[in-house]
């Protein structure tokens, strides 16, 4: 899938002949685990910590050079085997072929005309690599004893993948041998390529991903060397950082949530064939059919014979695409930049603001987003900023006034300002905040554009610079939009324009990932998807936010690492037909502690 660079392709489990003392590596792994388990560094110290962790990782990689499992041939040499295997096991293989596209790498190309909403691809459960198949594999005994594997399905999948890759007779070998040998996720970035991301909003997630992956490797290296249930694993004599990085990258770029066989819970899966599809803007058109027990995908649009077949991965930002999928998507209509805001506890009105926010279902401190499209802020961020800028009298009105409930409902509705003065304040604040963020970058927009145009850069360096450029463009648009809104409301205030009446209002939608948690039906009418954003009122949003704990998470606000504890259940309605979010963005960045 996507544009994934490939140094050498893997085909059969052949270990290298190099030799290194397990005890020597174990000592380095212990040092790495200790370093990665230390408290988070203070402001401005993250880069220093990253370099230190990277240095330890490179020492381990150097010791392990030549020990990784390798495969012969090129990735594409084994596409025919994959198609044959898929066909023999009930998957659809007609109407498309796997080819290399100049810009996006390998993908699916239509060999016949395919109509929009036509079911063209299905993959039965038996072909999927899942947490359940991992528990029933050679990994099962260790899984039953290790709390990290039990709690984090993505790590379980990564080890499942490694164990099956090391077995030449694995059922999934036709699939595994077609996976890329390396990826363009930041785990593969050189230090100079990561340096291009310094001062960006995304860099913190890059650091976190690298640190947590290193911590996981160090933890599991010790487990594999010392745990009695790890003795029979094919990784016992060769579990390298290189292998683990490959496995977690394979999983983070491909994992998806599907229902378990009885439909009672969700689990993680790798889906052969389907994961070859590249991304474009659109709607999610993939779901899981419990009746036929298979993953199904309908066409996003009409595809003519010879055209590439695209799917929509979800409403991801480019930071999420780069960090979790290893590519940058130009003209991403869902791109956004994180912005962390909170009400200071030293604010004399903190208690009142906290109460109003609580009634609206908004935390006093949270990470919001500035969007590429207009308006640049979500209903939730608008509501937060309104409360943040309220006077004492305005807060009292929202807590004790005659229309207090209506006022809470309309906090996220742009048509019903709290007051003209409040609107001027919030847009002024947003303009100032976005302007300050712009000043933290070491280069400006024009310099980045010039650098991209005039330098011969690696794929990863290009992605990094495009990502920081995209952040600046979003922030600059936010500054301009905020300034325009500020002046508009200032004019309304100066002219003494009347405020809209609350009794004429409809509840405003407060976003917070709740919309994405609605479960569309497989093969649903795609036109209905456009109305989802309007379907939830604030009241529904708050109540559904609590219900999300028992449901399937779609979209960008998924559970960390795309997994949940095995005991969690789907409700009865969700069990009938569950749709997973295309290309879960989750990665293996959850903390692992010894």
From Swiss-Prot:
<feature type="compositionally biased region" description="Polar residues">
    <location>
        <begin position="10"/>
        <end position="23"/>
    </location>
</feature>
<feature type="binding site">
    <location>
        <begin position="104"/>
        <end position="106"/>
    </location>
    <ligand>
        <name>S-adenosyl-L-methionine</name>
    </ligand>
</feature>
<feature type="binding site">
    <location>
        <begin position="325"/>
        <end position="327"/>
    </location>
    <ligand>
        <name>S-adenosyl-L-methionine</name>
    </ligand>
</feature>
<dbReference type="GO" id="GO:0018064">
    <property type="term" value="F:protein-L-histidine N-tele-methyltransferase activity"/>
</dbReference>
<keyword id="KW-0539">Nucleus</keyword>
<dbReference type="GO" id="GO:0003779">
    <property type="term" value="F:actin binding"/>
</dbReference>
<keyword id="KW-0832">Ubl conjugation</keyword>
<dbReference type="GO" id="GO:0018021">
    <property type="term" value="P:peptidyl-histidine methylation"/>
</dbReference>
<feature type="region of interest" description="Disordered">
    <location>
        <begin position="1"/>
        <end position="23"/>
    </location>
</feature>
<dbReference type="Pfam" id="PF09273">
    <property type="entry name" value="Rubis-subs-bind"/>
</dbReference>
<comment type="similarity">
    <text>Belongs to the class V-like SAM-binding methyltransferase superfamily. SETD3 actin-histidine methyltransferase family.</text>
</comment>
<dbReference type="InterPro" id="IPR046341">
    <property type="entry name" value="SET_dom_sf"/>
</dbReference>
<dbReference type="GO" id="GO:0045893">
    <property type="term" value="P:positive regulation of DNA-templated transcription"/>
</dbReference>
<dbReference type="InterPro" id="IPR050600">
    <property type="entry name" value="SETD3_SETD6_MTase"/>
</dbReference>
<dbReference type="GO" id="GO:0003713">
    <property type="term" value="F:transcription coactivator activity"/>
</dbReference>
<dbReference type="InterPro" id="IPR036464">
    <property type="entry name" value="Rubisco_LSMT_subst-bd_sf"/>
</dbReference>
<keyword id="KW-0489">Methyltransferase</keyword>
<feature type="compositionally biased region" description="Basic and acidic residues">
    <location>
        <begin position="564"/>
        <end position="594"/>
    </location>
</feature>
<feature type="binding site">
    <location>
        <position position="254"/>
    </location>
    <ligand>
        <name>S-adenosyl-L-methionine</name>
    </ligand>
</feature>
<dbReference type="InterPro" id="IPR025785">
    <property type="entry name" value="SETD3"/>
</dbReference>
<dbReference type="Pfam" id="PF00856">
    <property type="entry name" value="SET"/>
</dbReference>
<feature type="region of interest" description="Disordered">
    <location>
        <begin position="553"/>
        <end position="594"/>
    </location>
</feature>
<dbReference type="GO" id="GO:0070472">
    <property type="term" value="P:regulation of uterine smooth muscle contraction"/>
</dbReference>
<comment type="function">
    <text>Protein-histidine N-methyltransferase that specifically mediates 3-methylhistidine (tele-methylhistidine) methylation of actin at 'His-73'. Histidine methylation of actin is required for smooth muscle contraction of the laboring uterus during delivery. Does not have protein-lysine N-methyltransferase activity and probably only catalyzes histidine methylation of actin.</text>
</comment>
<keyword id="KW-0009">Actin-binding</keyword>
<dbReference type="InterPro" id="IPR044428">
    <property type="entry name" value="SETD3_SET"/>
</dbReference>
<comment type="subunit">
    <text>Interacts with MYOD1.</text>
</comment>
<feature type="domain" description="SET">
    <location>
        <begin position="94"/>
        <end position="314"/>
    </location>
</feature>
<dbReference type="InterPro" id="IPR001214">
    <property type="entry name" value="SET_dom"/>
</dbReference>
<dbReference type="InterPro" id="IPR015353">
    <property type="entry name" value="Rubisco_LSMT_subst-bd"/>
</dbReference>
<keyword id="KW-0949">S-adenosyl-L-methionine</keyword>
<keyword id="KW-0963">Cytoplasm</keyword>
<dbReference type="GO" id="GO:0005634">
    <property type="term" value="C:nucleus"/>
</dbReference>
<keyword id="KW-0808">Transferase</keyword>
<feature type="binding site">
    <location>
        <position position="75"/>
    </location>
    <ligand>
        <name>S-adenosyl-L-methionine</name>
    </ligand>
</feature>
<protein>
    <recommendedName>
        <fullName>Actin-histidine N-methyltransferase</fullName>
        <ecNumber>2.1.1.85</ecNumber>
    </recommendedName>
</protein>
<feature type="binding site">
    <location>
        <begin position="275"/>
        <end position="279"/>
    </location>
    <ligand>
        <name>S-adenosyl-L-methionine</name>
    </ligand>
</feature>
<dbReference type="GO" id="GO:0005737">
    <property type="term" value="C:cytoplasm"/>
</dbReference>
<dbReference type="GO" id="GO:0046975">
    <property type="term" value="F:histone H3K36 methyltransferase activity"/>
</dbReference>
<dbReference type="GO" id="GO:0030047">
    <property type="term" value="P:actin modification"/>
</dbReference>
<keyword id="KW-0597">Phosphoprotein</keyword>
């Amino acid at each position: 899938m996507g544009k994934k660079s490939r140094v050498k392709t893997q085909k059969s489990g052949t270990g290298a002949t190099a030799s290194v003392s397990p005890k020597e590596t174990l000592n380095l792994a212990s040092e790495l685990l200790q370093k990665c388990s230390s408290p988070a560094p203070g402001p401005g110290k993250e880069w220093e910590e990253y370099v230190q962790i990277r240095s330890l990782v490179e020492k381990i990689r150097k010791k392990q050079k030549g020990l990784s499992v390798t495969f012969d041939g090129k990735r594409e040499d084994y596409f025919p085997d994959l198609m044959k295997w898929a066909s023999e096991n009930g998957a659809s293989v007609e109407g498309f072929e796997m080819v290399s596209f100049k810009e996006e790498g390998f993908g699916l190309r239509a060999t016949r005309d395919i109509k929009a909403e036509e079911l063209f691809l299905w993959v039965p459960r038996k072909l999927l690599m899942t947490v359940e198949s991992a528990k029933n594999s050679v990994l099962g005994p260790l899984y039953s004893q290790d709390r990290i594997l039990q709690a984090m399905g993505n790590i379980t999948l990564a080890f499942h993948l490694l164990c099956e890759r090391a077995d030449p007779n694995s059922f999934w070998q036709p699939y595994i041998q077609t996976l890329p040998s390396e990826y363009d996720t930041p785990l593969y970035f050189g230090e100079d390529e990561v340096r291009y991301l310094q001062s960006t909003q995304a860099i913190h997630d890059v650091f976190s991903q690298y640190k947590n992956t290193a911590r996981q490797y160090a933890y599991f290296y010790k487990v594999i060397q010392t745990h009695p249930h790890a003795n029979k694993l094919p990784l016992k004599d060769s579990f390298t950082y290189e292998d683990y990085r490959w496995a977690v990258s394979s999983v983070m770029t491909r994992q998806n949530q599907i229902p378990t066989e009885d439909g009672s819970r969700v689990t993680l899966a790798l889906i052969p064939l389907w994961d070859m599809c590249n991304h474009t803007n659109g709607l999610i058109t993939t779901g899981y059919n419990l009746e036929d027990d298979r993953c199904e995908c309908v066409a996003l649009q009409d595809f003519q014979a010879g055209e590439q077949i695209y799917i929509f991965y979800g409403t991801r930002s480019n930071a999420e695409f780069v960090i979790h999928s290893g590519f940058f998507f130009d003209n991403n209509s869902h791109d956004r930049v994180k912005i962390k805001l909170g009400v200071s506890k030293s604010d004399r009105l903190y208690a009142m603001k906290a109460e109003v926010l609580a009634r609206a279902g908004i935390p006093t401190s949270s990470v919001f987003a500035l969007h590429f499209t207009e308006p640049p802020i979500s209903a939730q961020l608008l509501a937060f900023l309104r409360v943040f800028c309220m006077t004492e009298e305005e807060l009292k009105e929202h807590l004790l006034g005659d229309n207090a409930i209506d006022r809470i409902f309309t906090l996220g509705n742009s048509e019903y300002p709290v007051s003209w003065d409040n609107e001027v304040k919030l847009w002024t604040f947003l303009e100032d905040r976005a302007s300050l963020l712009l000043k933290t970058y070491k280069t400006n927009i024009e310099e980045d554009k010039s650098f991209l145009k005039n330098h011969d850069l690696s794929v990863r360096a290009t992605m990094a610079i495009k990502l920081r450029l995209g952040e600046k463009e979003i922030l600059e648009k936010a500054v301009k939009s905020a300034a325009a809104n500020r002046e508009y409301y200032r004019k309304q205030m100066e002219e003494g324009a009347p405020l809209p009446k609350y009794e004429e209002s409809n509840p405003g939608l407060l976003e917070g990932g709740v919309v994405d948690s609605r479960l569309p039906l497989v093969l649903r009418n795609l036109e209905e998807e456009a109305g989802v954003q309007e379907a939830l009122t604030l009241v529904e949003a708050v109540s559904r936010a609590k219900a999300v704990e028992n449901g399937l998470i779609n979209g960008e606000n998924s559970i960390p690492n795309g997994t949940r504890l095995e005991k969690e259940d789907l409700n009865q309605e969700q069990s009938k037909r569950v749709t997973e979010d295309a290309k879960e963005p989750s990665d293996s960045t959850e903390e692992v502690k010894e």
